[in-house]
Amino acid sequence: MDPLERLYLDAMMEDPEVPARSLRPQLLAGARARRRPAAPTAAWAEPYAGRVAAMDALLTSAVDDDWSRVIVEGWTLQELVAHLAAKDGLLAASVGAPVLGPPMGATDSLGRTSDVQAYERTRSPEQTRRDWRAQADALCRHLADLPPTTPATLDGMEVPVRDHLLARCLETWIHTADAARTARLRLPDPVAEHIHPTADLCARLLPWTMLLSGMDGSGRTLHLTLTGAGGGEWQVPLGVEDTRPGTPDAHITADVVAFCFLLGGRGEPAEFPAELAGDLPLARDVLTSAPALSGP
């Protein structure tokens, strides 16, 4: 079975209704038996492990021409996978997990990416894929014994490891979609149980994206409604030092997947499809600043 077919079968899990006499349970069982599963890890780390498995299924289907095709940031598919391995390795180093690839020199994302990409250019794409997956799996296994509140530092930012891992989940998801789009393939969305915590991270980042964009949201509150599987509602205090939300000043309603991708730097804020209410300039500022933390 083609790895992309396995992805589509996994996506069927999002629909709990199984028609009578459906062959879907047998198809899913067969697909799981033949695909490489997500690495065993803590429940809170499963969204990341799931995106790694999805990316690996996509990469398994790549042929020689795919690996040399430019995907994003001027990087080929092989260089993109090396970038993911570099950032996963930095997080692994922060929590004491094994670090694969070249010896650790630079400890920032851009520097480590450059080092790992240079190293992987001397190797085959399949070696790059295997080592990226091995790095991700080693991180997952290590996290199985850690509480989600364990402090971790990446690019000078110390937050609970769960938040860093959700950020890794979002980036892996987005870059898998980048690669699938370049190959003209439709990538199924993650299951709702994996989308929701990722969306929660995106909602909690909004005060920081506003601050980085030079906008002061102190004392103001956003009511955010994200629709679709994995969505929900959030009352978001828009000042980084605000401790609790107040009465909502602005309201934004948008698709949950599109919103996550906007935070990840995909899509133009000015053209983002959303319903706005209340303080419209504030709502527009939230959307304009949303991609501020995105990067390669």
Feature map (PLM): residue ranges:
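Structured surface interface patches that mediate subunit assembly and partner/cofactor docking
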Residues: M1-W44, W67-G74, V95-D108, R121, ...
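Active-site-adjacent bridging/hinge elements
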Residues: L4-E5, M55-A62, P148
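Long amphipathic N-terminal alpha/beta scaffold segment
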Residues: R36-L59
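Acidic/histidine-rich alpha-helical segments that form the ligand environment
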Residues: R51, M55, T113-T149, L165-R168, ...
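Active-site-proximal cofactor/substrate-binding loop regions of enzyme domains
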Residues: R51-A53, A57, D65, V72-A92, ...
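Structural signal for well-ordered, non-membrane alpha-helices
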Residues: D56, D88-A92, A136-C140, A144, ...
